[in-house]
Amino acid sequence: MGVRGLQTFIEENCPDACKEVSIEELAKNHKARFNVQPVLVIDGLNWLVSMYRLGDSVSVFGGEWLQFARTLQFFIAKFKNIGVKPIFIFDGTVCESKRKTWVARRIRSYDAVLCIFEDFKECFRGESDSGGIPTMIDKLCCFIVKESGADAFQSNTEADFVIAKYAAEHKDVFAILSQDSDYIIFNTKMYLSMLHFDFISFCTIQYDRTCLALKYLHLQVEQLPLFSCLVGNDIVRFEMLKPFLLSLCHTQHVYMANYVENLCNFIKEENWTGDTSSWREMCQISLKVFGSIDKAYLIHEGLKSYALNCDIPSPKVCIKVSSKMEKTVHERHWNCLNAPYIFDLLCKMEFSQREVLEDESRLPCAILYREIRQRCYGVLFNCFVPPHSVANPGKTRSGDSIIIDEWCAYQGNSMDEPEYVKPLPLKNLSVARNVVPKIEDLWFKLSSKEKLKVFWHILEIPMKFDLLADLPNDHIVLACTLSSLIGGLEESPLIQPLEVAVFVAQALWNKKIKELLNLPIPWLDADAVNLCTLFLCGVSTMFLVLSTCGSPIPVIHIMPWRYFDGKLFHHLLNKARIKPSVNELCKNQRSTVKKFYKLLRVVTSNSIYDVDQYPWGNVLKDFER
């Protein structure tokens, strides 16, 4: 996203507006000038993609989570060592104005995912990688950042606006690190390139907006938003502007270098300033550019999206709640204390999930976990709290039915419009006087054990609650995800006994970075890749349910590196298929073997794979009852 063609133009045609800079020197100068600790605001998702590609991690395995977390901790420490305080801000929602762009990207990315699975048929080695990021890491990275000792926040509107505004309003911020050409347009602190960032020297390129405007465009900095709206951005689409831009070109190729001089002269001749308070100017621009005044509102919206002196109002919770609840929803979202889905659900009645690494061999994960989400919706919106019932569910503030717009990227879903999903009731809930608790009571009044009981009811898994309640916090998400895959989602298991055993065993390894790095790159097959995706989508769903229930366990225990490593899982699964042995899975360590039997008993309890009933000796040759 950003301004169409601007990065290429500035790098190829504006040498003085692209300066190599040292972040350490910039920070020192800022501290000397303002006597504050210098802060660098980092576009979180942008950083995540760049840093993940930096390492040796292979995303198709499902994520080498511990290695990624340690790498992130290393770079955060390095920032602090040069006197810079990094603050990460992540996309916390998809704005309505960007939904079409989001959908188009998801469709393109899902086509790429299917190509990856085609590659698996030709090459089963780990080197055949997607070049992307592991499933769900975009939803979880802000929590990894927080545990690594840095500040992390989630936006409640378009992240580039939030980042630009935060930087402009805080004197201690000296720069923004990202790769989005919109930051050249915003009148905020200096914009540093993530693409050119050197992870060793901490040097990069500064895109100088003042130099670009005055020296190369011959416009004022304040006119850059208008320039953006006339060359194409996320609101005023390039496709709409193409006929106008073509009329300014010397050739039939609509490249910025071919029309930029004529465009800037045109702006000056018309005396356009981009003043959003002048509706007359908006109409004049629309008439000249599009041939009618019909697009004046679009120009106005495009310009307003860069106006940092405007506050974008935060959406309110869609049902009637107390001011305390309203405030808590926004604070938990901003401070990364809830799953990011909660804000979108409560305030916009939307659920968004990007493409994941899966093929067409089974139902898409988005559909498999949908009923669990639907039960979350029922709890979040008080749909079935008396006097409401299944026959008479709760409504929004305005009296509308609770219907969630689900935007989930999977094969066969064109996302021309959302899927409309209704809440589902809970079965046999026995806490809080035999009724479904109000969402405010669930968050603020119930004990952790009572919250965990609601969590268990939402999942509808075979595992007995008492066994769940006795688990260490680090094993709750793992155990519940596996129990769902065995008997909570479909009538027949979605996971084989040997695969269950491998998931349990790898969770119990005392993982060390060096040992994980030294593991040989495993052979890959589509089934194992699909399985890891299914598991990680389950982890993400557990996060949603736990946040729905007021976080009965601390967020940090939900993070995958506590119980999962993708490379280790593939390595152990390959070994187990050749030599299925408990002792081999557990590194021949008696203490690990003992923990394995204990955790496996919990995971499979009351299911078709229950260790007291299923012939596990046929699965693992040295299995002992």
PLM segments and residue spans:
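Short, flexible loop segments at the rims of nucleotide/cofactor-binding pockets, characterized by
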Residues: 64-65, 130, 151-155
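Acidic, metal-binding active-site segment of PIN/NYN-like and related structure-specific nucleases
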Residues: 166-194
